[in-house]
Regions:
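Conserved N-terminal phosphate-binding loop of PLP-dependent enzymes in the Aspartate aminotransferase
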Residues: 1-430
């Protein structure tokens, strides 16, 4: 069967034929390729087409797909049993690795998804402070829990529905919205609601409305404001964690939050996430505190094995982040060179191995700037990139993920694809 036929069948069985909306390729007007396997820097569809992968399962595959050490660890763990619903030494070992890499994680809990990690962190912050209000930023995405589906990014932004039906107004009445990279908007909220705000949650690098870096002083400003008002500062590092640096964005920018959520890389590609932070806050979590959180599959031994293998690889290979920076800078240069060569009205944003191209003539520093990008031009760029053998996110509002498995030949092919895509997207859509 080919992707079109599988997709038709999938649409009879699953909403939109997919298990996560952006995978349906609606934003680019195409049928999604159905994937058969992946290895290293490549992903293969059911027709046998090989693509250079810049999605990387939406971030986890920082070292490439099916890394031998990770596969070996998963296999060994699965042979012993796929789930116990009981504590294991593997959980302790992984927690120690996380704490070594990210010292602010004094205590932590393992869960199954980024959504669950964020949902739990917010509940704990509310329990710790005795307050109800949460501050989030427009365009930032923190999973699909009800209270955070307000002016959200990622798939909601892709589908042009930043709020979700099915969420009672009462669930979002305690969610306050600030503007990313705008400290004044944050200060105004705290001046009005400061004694009611339990936590402020932020993607330290916004990566779910495309990649938008924090401006100088923004993250430190958030740290100062939350400290002044006694609110918990939560960094959502589901994407940035272990990607920008071994210690995540908090290490990269030198700003320490009270709590952090991790996902994607921390599970080595398996369903795994972690939340945690200061000991006095995490002491509120059951069974030693009054905030309840539980999960049958939390700390799943197979996922724990994958995450442990992944973090060990990142810790042992001290040059991996230098290589990622070199490869990412080279791809960024290819984008910027083609933009200049073909006089394309576009902006390229990059932080480490995360980047985005926006088809707009204004610098992209905020959600409002993001919304000026021409989506038809992005769709044309996407179609040419796919035809050139590049597997990239089918949405303007998702990141371009660089991985360490990319070879010199892959980079050269990518440079040629970018040149072709920006040439054609400019000529046909400008």
């Amino acid at each position: 069967m080919n992707s079109q036929k599988i997709f038709e069948k999938a649409c009879e069985l699953m909403p939109g034929g997919v298990n996560s909306p952006v995978r349906a390729y609606r934003a680019v007007g195409m049928t999604p390729p159905f994937i058969f396997r992946a290895k290293g820097a490549y992903i293969y569809d059911v027709e046998g087409h090989q693509y250079v992968d810049y999605v990387g399962s939406w971030g986890p595959m920082i070292l490439g797909h099916a890394k031998d050490e990770v596969v070996k660890a998963v296999t060994a763990a699965a042979i012993k049993g796929t789930s116990f619903g009981a504590p294991t030494n593997g959980e302790v070992e992984l927690a120690e690795l996380i704490q070594t890499a990210v010292p602010s994680m004094e205590m932590m809990r393992m869960v199954n998804s980024g959504t669950e990690a964020v949902m739990s962190a917010i509940r704990v912050a509310r329990g710790y402070t005795g307050r109800d209000y949460i501050v989030k930023f427009e365009g930032c995405y923190h999973g699909h829990s009800d209270g955070l589906l307000v002016k959200a990014g990622s798939g909601l932004l892709t589908e042009n529905v930043p709020d979700s039906a099915g969420v009672p107004k009462a669930f979002t009445d305690t969610t306050l919205i600030a503007r990313y990279n705008d400290l004044d908007s944050v200060r105004k909220l705290f001046e009005q609601y400061g004694d009611k705000i339990a936590a402020l949650i932020v993607e330290p690098v916004a990566a779910n409305m495309g990649v938008v870096p924090p401006e100088d002083g923004f993250l430190q400003g958030l740290r100062d404001i939350t400290k002044q008002y006694g609110a918990v500062l939560i960094f959502d590092e589901v994407i940035t964690g272990f990607r920008l640096a071994l210690g995540g964005a908090q290490s990269y920018y030198g700003v320490t939050p009270d709590m952090t959520t991790f996902g994607k890389i921390v599970g080595g590609g398996m369903p795994m996430a972690v939340y945690g932070g200061r000991r006095e806050i995490m002491d509120c979590v059951s069974p030693i505190g009054p905030v309840y959180q539980a999960g049958t599959l939390s700390g799943n031994p197979v996922a724990v094995a994958a995450g442990t293998a992944m973090l060990k690889l990142l810790m042992e290979d001290t040059a991996v982040y230098e290589r990622l920076e070199e490869k990412s800078a080279r791809i960024e240069h290819a984008f910027k060179s083609a933009v200049e060569k073909y006089h394309v009205k576009a902006q390229v944003n990059r932080v480490g191995s995360l980047m985005s191209i926006f088809f707009t003539d204004r610098p992209v520093k905020s959600f409002d700037d993001v919304r000026t990008s021409k989506l038809a031009q992005f769709a044309q760029y996407f179609r040419v990139m796919k035809a050139q053998g590049m597997y990239i996110a089918p949405s303007q509002y998702e990141a371009f993920f660089v991985n360490d498995a990319l070879s010199e030949a892959d980079l050269q092919k990518t440079e040629k694809a970018i040149d072709a895509a920006l040439s054609q997207s400019f000529n046909e859509c400008s």
